[in-house]
Amino acid sequence: MPPQPKWKKEEEEEDSTRFTMGYWQMRGLGAPIRMLLHWGKQNAEKTKPFAFKDVQYTQDGDGVNKWFKEDKVKMIEESNPLANIPYLIDHEEKKTIVHFLATCDYLGQKFGLDEKEVDSEQRERNAQIAMEVYDLRNNVIRLVYKFPNSVRTQEEFDKQLPEHLNACKKTYQKLESWLGFYDFTYFAKKDEVSSCDFHAFEMIDQHEHYQTLLAGDEKRDVLSEFPRLKKFHQAMRNRPELKTYFESKEYTDFQLNNHTLANSWDGPGPSSMK
């Protein structure tokens, strides 16, 4: 048997909290996981079903340096050698799950959103949509963060945003066709939510905001061209299980993505507060 991680209590947090989720203080990849946790709390037995540890994306004692030099090192030694953000601590099961897709899959099964049989059709559909939506997320990363051959200034961001929105229509069309092919409201089950739906919602929701940043004549309503996607987006927004999430600061106040730290350049950093 391989060596097992040493599990140490952290201020007795697991005695009252079922899940602790850690991520940067933004929506990004954290938003779908936060949504899942809000969804799951309806059947929670714990007094405090979840807690968030939001890491500030600043190079100071409470931000990036603390995560990489202290918290991540501790996690590697005590609970998961793959330590990364986002992470999820399941205090009841004494597990630390890392990486976005793995965390969504874990919570999807914990909350009964996804079927447990690996070869089930729901699991197959869920996995395919999860990867398709992640491709769209990767395209967003190239738009909002400073990478070679990507945006470096506010002017470049303003120029590339319309091009990005036009390009994302290809993904929207594939997702629209998928919903039409199966005649589903949601992506992996006809009338019931699966874990892939949370990231799909977040990416559509982010793009709804990006459209508001366009100049006058360039403003558009991309989602109106895809009625099934629009219905899906509205159906998720109206779910009573997510009401507390949509009222939370994590949804209303957090930036969609972080400002980059590269070369002290803040970048456009689209924010839900703009």
Feature roles, as predicted:
Residues 2-162, 170, 272-274:
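GST-like domain detector, emphasizing the conserved glutathione-binding G-site
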Residues 102, 228, 241:
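Residue-level recognition of oxygen-bearing side chains
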Residues 107, 121, 125-238:
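GST-like fold's C-terminal all-alpha helical module
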Residues 242-244, 250-274:
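C-terminal helix/juxtamembrane-tail motif
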